Amino acid sequence: MTHPIRKTHPVIKIMNTALIDLPAPINISAWWNFGFLLGMCLSIQIFTGLFLSMHYIPHIDLAFSSVSHICRDVNFGWLLRVLHANGGSMFFICLYIHIARGIYYSSFHLYFTWMTGVVLLILVMATAFLGYVLPWGQMSFWGATVITNLISAVPYVGSMMVQWLWGGFSVDNATLTRFFTLHFILPFVVLAMVAIHLLFLHQTGSNNPLGLNSNAEKIPFHPYFTIKDLFGVVVMVWLLMILVLSGPYLLSDPDNFIPANPLVTPTHIQPEWYFLFAYAILRSIPNKLGGVVALLASVVILIILPLYKNKFMSSSFYPLNQMLFWGFISIFILLTWIGAQAIEEPFYTSAQILTSLYFFYFILSPLLSVLWDYVME
C-alpha cells in the first residue's frame, strides 16, 4: 500500500505533522484560534511590508514624501499602506487575546512554549515601534526621540548607548536608516521564532479549556480545526477590511500627517494605541529610571508565571481567580485609555493606582489559587 506523499516527502511531512495530521485536543474552543490568526497577521504584514519597502526611501528629506507618493501614485499603494498600518493593530489585538487566553487557562505551564512566546512579544513590540518611526511625521520623530531617550536612564552607560543607537547626538538620518533596516529584518527573526514556538508547542501538545491530559482522545487538526480556524480568518479579514476601507486612519495620530520638525514639539506625545498601557505605566512613576524599570516589568513580568503552582490548570475551577482576571483585563483597558490622556488630574493619580493594581494581580493570583485549593480540600 502506497503512503500519501505528505507522509513520506522530507519537506512536506514537516508541514503535515504541524498542520494536517497534528493531534489536537477534541475540546479546544474558539480562544485557540488566535495562534492561527497571528500567523495570518504576520503573513499580511510581511507581504504588504515587502511591497511598501520597494517604494519607501529611508532618508529624512524624502521619507515623508515617499509615503505620500505611495498613497497617491503607486497602484493600490494607499491600500498597501493602510493594510500594513491597521494590520499591525489587528496583530496586537490577536496577540493580547492570545496572551490573555494563555493566562486564563494557565498555558504558561508549557514552559518553553511560554518563554519563546514572551520573546516573540518583545520582538513584535520592537518591530512595531521601529515601523512607527518610518513615516517621519511629527509623532514618528518625537515618539522616537522620547522613547529612545529612556535608555539614557541606564546608569553609567545610558547616554553613550543613546548616542550609539541614534548614530549621533540627536534623532537624525542615521537613526532613520538603521530603524528601517531593523524594521525590515526583524519580521523574519519573528518568523524564525514562530517556528521555534511551534516546535516547543508540538513537543507537549496544546492545552485545553479543562486543563486535563487529552492524549487519550485527540483528533487530527485537518479538517476539523482548519475549518474552525478559517472561519476565524474570514471574520478577522472582514473586520480588517471594514477598518481599512471605512476608517483607515481611525487608529493613527493626526500629528503624523505633519512632516517631522525638530523645532516644534507636539502638545501631546504618545505611541500607537497598543503601547498605551505600558506608556501609562511609564508616566505614572515620577522617577525616570523607576519609570523605565516599570515599563520593562509590565511586559517581562510574564516570565514569572510558570513559577505559579496550582492543582488545576484552568481558571474555570477558580471562581476568585476568574473575577481577578477580568478585573485585570479592565485595568489593562483603563491604562490604555489613560495613556492617551494628558498628564494631569485625575489621570495621573488614576494611572498610579491602576499601575499598582496591574502588578498586584501577579502577586494576588497565585495566592488566591492556593487559598481556593485549601478551601476545596
Curated annotation (Swiss-Prot):
Predominant subcellular localization, coarse grouping: mitochondrion
Q: What are the binding positions for heme b b562 in this chain?
A: 84, 183
One GO cellular component this record assigns the protein to is:
mitochondrial inner membrane
User: Which cofactors does this gene product need?
Assistant: heme b
Any idea what this protein is called? Answer: Cytochrome b
Checking InterPro entries in the record gives:
Cyt_b/b6_C, Cyt_b/b6_C_sf, Cyt_b/b6_N, Cytb/b6-like_sf, Cytochrome_b, Cytochrome_b_C_euk/bac, Cytochrome_b_N_euk/bac, Di-haem_cyt_TM
Q: Where in the cell is it found?
A: Mitochondrion inner membrane
User: What is the organism lineage in this UniProt record?
Assistant: Eukaryota, Metazoa, Ecdysozoa, Scalidophora, Priapulida
Q: Which family does it belong to?
A: Belongs to the cytochrome b family.
* UniProt cofactor note: Binds 2 heme b groups non-covalently.
Name of the encoding gene: mt:Cyt-b
Q: Identify the PANTHER family for this entry.
A: CYTOCHROME B (PTHR19271:SF16)
